[in-house]
Amino acid sequence: MMKKYYESDADLSVLSGKKIAVIGYGSQGRGQSLNLRDSGLDVIIGLRKGKSWDAAAKDGMNVMTVAEAAKKADIIQILLPDELQAAVYKNEILPHLSENKVLMFSHGFNIHFGQIQPPGNVDVIMVAPKGPGFMVRRQYEEGKGVPALIAIHQDHTCKAHKTALAYAKGIGATRAVVLETTFREETETDLFGEQAVLCGGTASLIKAGFETLVDAGYAPEMAYLEVCHELKLIVDLIYEGGLTNMRQYVSNTAQYGDMTRGPRVIGPEAYEAMEEILAEIQSGEFAKEWMLENMVNRPVFNALTKADEEHLLEETGKEVRAMMPQFRK
């Protein structure tokens, strides 16, 4: 059973007098830093000059270079894309990572796969909200919170756990629930979820269903509505109460088809593929592949992205959404 923590388990005063540098101002960077600031904490933003710098300044944040932020901060939260973290850490953070500082992440990729290897005289922790940055911010503003994971990789000061919980409280996570995990578990399950179910599995299932209907002569608009547009309605029901809840709201015909035909779509071959995907993650094969892909300017990534953007599914989706007032800007 995972350990769980709530508001009363975390002490925000642990961060009193501490300067927190958030490196990056994308979705998570913005959401977390604004919440920390509104929780009364001392936050600075480390960035390179550009749109993110301007956005952070417009939000009233104290913005400076990454190196300046790392030098001034007691706690350094790296919220850059995985593929950029190692270089920024080596060139702009490590020179200022003095004893007893705290190095923090919201995903364990670079620590777990050895892309970043911190010195032994600092704390290394993770606070990972289980939701996108805009939702972290929205829930906080509504007096709620997005659940989060915490993990301790290195506890030089013997205060790492309290620091992680305090930070989680600062971004509003303890209003929901904070669960304790490890860098390994968070990294491997997160990557697997993205690849096999949430992004890869779902996207491939939608495209396969769409293509099957269109190839059989059905209108692309009908195919889109049935296999993509309506998916949100089903996912919302599952999110609210699991598969059982979803099945209480669909027809008996739909439920019977679900239980008898679904396993034919996701059958033994799918399980074998999932096991292979998990093994590639666990061995570090995927991480190595992704790092190499970035070293050669992402030829596979760019080609696959372009192909999906030009897929009939995407063109049809634009046309269908244009018919509906709620999607008109």
From Swiss-Prot:
Residues 182-327 form the KARI C-terminal knotted domain. Pathway: Amino-acid biosynthesis; L-isoleucine biosynthesis; L-isoleucine from 2-oxobutanoate: step 2/4; Amino-acid biosynthesis; L-valine biosynthesis; L-valine from pyruvate: step 2/4. The keyword Ligase does not apply. Substrate binds at residue 251. The keyword NADP applies. Its EC number is 1.1.1.86. GO terms for biological process: isoleucine biosynthetic process; L-valine biosynthetic process. The active site is at residue 107. Mg(2+) 2 binds at residues 190, 226, 230. Keywords: Amino-acid biosynthesis, Branched-chain amino acid biosynthesis, Magnesium, Metal-binding, NADP, Oxidoreductase. NADP(+) binds at residues 25-28, 48, 52, 82-85, 133. Its cofactor is Mg(2+). Mg(2+) 1 binds at residues 190, 194. Involved in the biosynthesis of branched-chain amino acids (BCAA). Catalyzes an alkyl-migration followed by a ketol-acid reduction of (S)-2-acetolactate (S2AL) to yield (R)-2,3-dihydroxy-isovalerate. In the isomerase reaction, S2AL is rearranged via a Mg-dependent methyl migration to produce 3-hydroxy-3-methyl-2-ketobutyrate (HMKB). In the reductase reaction, this 2-ketoacid undergoes a metal-dependent reduction by NADPH to yield (R)-2,3-dihydroxy-isovalerate. Belongs to the ketol-acid reductoisomerase family. This is Ketol-acid reductoisomerase (NADP(+)). The gene is ilvC.
